[in-house]
């Protein structure tokens, strides 16, 4: 059983919802990442999504695009991101780590080499934003054989057939994109999202996480009433951007926001 599956089972039995923060590896500089990952776990994170910096992050809004830019100034790469995961794993063997990024760096490294390195580093899941299930035929079986969970993005307009295909290929959880557009967008219609999640549940038994547009504890708590996990990204990355020259302040601001969200989810 994967760490992700085990984590969601434990949470389900405890009637709790997963809190999944996202940060970009190496933002604002590489030495910040691992300490803040540990701090996020202490603040109540159940899973961590770690973004792989990329020069053309088309699915990301301005906040996370700038995070990639800050990380790339320090020559961050997929390989260096995996090194950070391995460093995190030296002290934390239980918190699942999901790499979130684009296909190009994986293709440049080579599918098999990436899978081998990700497994060795202690990665648990791989979410490749621009790899639709129709094009995942070679990559996904490699992930399965290595015990890595492929995670797919569900859009509000995904057809039933597409949801079922992603559920058949995916492991760990499905990531429902609560808004049409890029990360960090606003105007979240919670009633519409809740209705959509209820329908998706009729098509798959995989846990469902909801992200894009989660800005505060109130929204996190509302999503937690019908989803299995709440993913928060841009709101945390904004804290890093606002205090990028003051790492201790950035870490405190991230921890404070996550702690409030954790309390709201558990209330």
Curated annotation (Swiss-Prot):
Active-site residues (renumbered): 49 (proton acceptor), 60 (proton acceptor)
Enzyme kind, highest EC tier: lyase
UniProt cross-references to InterPro entries, sorted A to Z: Aldolase_TIM, RibuloseP-bd_barrel, Trp_synthase_alpha_AS, Trp_synthase_suA
GO CC annotations on file: cytosol
CDD domains: Tryptophan_synthase_alpha
Keywords from the UniProt entry: Amino-acid biosynthesis, Aromatic amino acid biosynthesis, Lyase, Tryptophan biosynthesis
UniProt feature coiled coil, ranges: none
A GO MF term: tryptophan synthase activity
EC annotation from Swiss-Prot or TrEMBL: 4.2.1.20
Keyword set includes Nucleotide-binding: no
Domain of life: Bacteria
A Pfam family matched in the record: Trp_syntA
Pathway of action: Amino-acid biosynthesis; L-tryptophan biosynthesis; L-tryptophan from chorismate: step 5/5
Catalytic activity: (1S,2R)-1-C-(indol-3-yl)glycerol 3-phosphate + L-serine = D-glyceraldehyde 3-phosphate + L-tryptophan + H2O
Recorded family membership: Belongs to the TrpA family.
Xref: HAMAP family: Trp_synth_alpha
Subunit structure: Tetramer of two alpha and two beta chains.
Function: The alpha subunit is responsible for the aldol cleavage of indoleglycerol phosphate to indole and glyceraldehyde 3-phosphate.
Protein's name according to its UniProt entry: Tryptophan synthase alpha chain
Taxonomic path: Bacteria, Pseudomonadati, Pseudomonadota, Gammaproteobacteria, Methylococcales
């Amino acid at each position: 059983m994967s760490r992700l599956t085990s984590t969601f089972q434990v949470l389900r039995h405890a009637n709790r919802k997963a809190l999944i923060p996202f940060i970009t590896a190496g933002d604002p500089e590489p030495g910040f990442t691992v300490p803040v990952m540990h701090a996020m776990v202490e603040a109540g994170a159940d899973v961590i999504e770690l973004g792989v910096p990329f020069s053309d992050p088309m699915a990301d809004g301005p906040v996370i695009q700038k995070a990639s830019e800050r990380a790339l100034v320090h020559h961050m790469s997929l390989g260096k991101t995996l090194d950070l995961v391995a460093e995190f794993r030296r002290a934390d063997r239980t918190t699942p780590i999901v790499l979130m990024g684009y296909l190009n760096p994986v293709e440049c490294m080579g599918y098999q080499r990436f899978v081998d390195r990700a497994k060795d580093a202690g990665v648990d899941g791989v979410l490749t934003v621009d790899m639709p299930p129709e094009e995942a035929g070679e990559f996904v079986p490699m992930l399965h054989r290595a015990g890595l969970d492929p995670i797919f993005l569900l859009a509000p307009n995904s057809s039933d057939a597409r949801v079922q295909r992603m559920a058949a290929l995916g492991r760990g959880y499905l990531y429902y994109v609560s808004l049409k557009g890029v990360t960090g967008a606003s105007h979240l219609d919670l009633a519409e999202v809740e209705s959509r999640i209820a329908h998706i549940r009729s098509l798959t038994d995989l846990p469902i996480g909801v992200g894009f547009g989660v800005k505060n504890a109130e929204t996190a708590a509302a999503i937690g009433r019908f989803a299995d996990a709440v993913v928060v990204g841009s709101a945390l990355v904004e804290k890093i951007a606002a205090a990028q020259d003051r790492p201790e302040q950035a870490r405190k601001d991230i921890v404070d926001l996550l702690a409030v969200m954790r309390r709201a989810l558990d209330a």
